[in-house]
């Protein structure tokens, strides 16, 4: 990381901002978890603003972030920009209800849990159990953080056998986002 990047990161931290971009993996999860913990300890901010632009990634890494977000005593406001997909969408949904904002151009993707497994028969059977557990965690997360009230409806609309791309309006309808808002309210989708 360059000296300029470190200065910019420090400036974001002064305002309680976490920027999560790219694939969610262990390193990104560790960074985000540490930042949330530091904000809770420091007492310097009254809320955390998490800006997310992520195509998804690892379930264990994402659920580690979600666990720390739920642990946080500070409210965490989430803003989705660019793309919030797969595990990125689950992290976004965990934000404080009423403060989960997406921009009009945000792409949203929901899909069933997917994985690739290699190994002998016994290893594949053991791996299948973990896959079932991950699927159950994902279903329970949607039921907790969306307006969908049953596994059947969830699998009909959002966790189908094919990728489900959502408009920002559909995200509001399903209760996985609360507000559609341009980052600059003066623009309102019009040309300057």
Predicted regions and their residues:
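Terminal-region recognition feature
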Residues: 1-192
